[in-house]
Each structure stands twice: as structure tokens, then as C-alpha cells.
Amino acid sequence: MSLRFHWFLPTNGDGRDIVGGGHGVATGAAGTIRPASLAYLGQVARSAEQLGFEAALTPTGAWCEDAWLVTAMLTEVTERLKFLVAFRPGLISPTLSAQMAATFQRHSRGRLLLNVVTGGESAEQRAYGD
């Protein structure tokens, strides 16, 4: 049995603490050291790849950048790193989700992994109509 390790892309900005996970914290808030710029996220992704991580988890939610768009852009600055894209199936149609996933897989040479989530914060779920 081999172990595979994944990293995390801080698409709401990065800081010294992991408490709170970034949920509901605006980019640039107190404690956030680096905003979630494409340049910084590219740096994180390339570092994870160089260190041998298999994939990078990319969160979804109103509090962070769009996981699909960010990871699609990051495929251009990485070679092997896979992207574990979190998405909520109730927010977009199944047909569109399938098309997005197929396009991503084709253009990234098979580097998409999906993390189907239901959400976990009641205020955000209400805002999305759950």
C-alpha cells in the first residue's frame, strides 16, 4: 500500500494560523499575510508539486475564489500536480458539471479529482438557497 499526500490551496488568502479554515474571513483580513493572488497560488502549487504531493485540495464557498477557475489556471504552471476541486452539485446543473469536468480533464491531461461537498455553514447554505 502506498500513501498519497495532498496539500491545500489557500484561495481565501494565507496566514500563519489554520484555525477557522478561512471560512467567512475576507481576503486581507487581520491575520491574513498573503492574499490569494494567482502568482502566490501558483507558487504554492509548484512547491507542492516539487515536494511530491499528489494533489492540492481547493475549497469551495462564498468566502474563497472559485475552485474551477483557479485550478484551471494553475494547470498551466504545474506539470503533474492534480487538483482536488471541491464543488457543491446543487449549485450547478449536472450537465454543466459533467462538461466542465470533461473539459478540465482533457486540457489538464487527466489531473482533475472531485470532492463533492454539501456545505457546512448554515448562513452560506441559506444564501445559496439550501
Stretches with model-predicted labels:
Residues M1-T78:
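N-terminal beta1-alpha1-beta2 module of alpha/beta enzyme domains
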Residues S2-R34, S93-D130:
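Flexible, glycine-rich active-site loops centered on histidine and acidic residues
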Residues A45, A72-T75, R88, A98-Q105:
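Short, well-ordered alpha-helical packing segments
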Residues A56, F83, L112-L114:
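Hydrophobic residues within beta-strands of alpha/beta enzymes
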Residues T60-W63, V85-S93:
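Active-site nucleophile and cofactor-binding loops and adjacent substrate-binding regions
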Residues T78-L84:
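Conserved catalytic cysteine-centered active-site region
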